[in-house]
Amino acid sequence: MGLSEGEWQLVLNVWGKVEADLAGHGQDVLIRLFKGHPETLEKFDKFKHLKTEAEMKASEDLKKHGNTVLTALGGILKKKGHHDAELKPLAQSHATKHKIPIKYLEFISEAIIHVLHSRHPAEFGADAQGAMNKALELFRKDIATKYKELGFHG
């Protein structure tokens, strides 16, 4: 399940592109998530009222949250699988406060892959997509373990 050093390098190379515009990428990821899986919007009191893509694009709060999400994910990815310290508080808040099911993390992973491919087709070919999929799967597996430790089976 672990990634090779070469796979981590592919992940981090494309992540460098993401970091040039975290808020924009994050906004695109959340819009893709909410459009593809409208049920996920119900978990966000701040965004529930946003019904159209235009409303979502105009929301500074959505852009800020997208930045927060991708900043946290970037910190996790840079740990190359040694992310226990970063996952603990994230699992705690997502399991006990926000009650975000693992399935929703799969949905946002799909949105991330889609956005990276559409924004960076040259840097995000099949090998990089495969590596990112593995990295996101590792993240989900490890956060699911933390969820269970917290008694959340979402």
UniProtKB/Swiss-Prot annotation:
The compartments listed are: Cytoplasm, Sarcoplasm
Q: Where does heme b bind?
A: H94
List, alphabetically, the PANTHER family matched: MYOGLOBIN
Say yes or no: keyword NADP present.
no
Q: Which InterPro entries match?
A: Globin, Globin-like_sf, Myoglobin
What is catalysed by this protein?
A: Fe(III)-heme b-[protein] + nitric oxide + H2O = Fe(II)-heme b-[protein] + nitrite + 2 H(+); H2O2 + AH2 = A + 2 H2O
Name of this chain's protein: Myoglobin
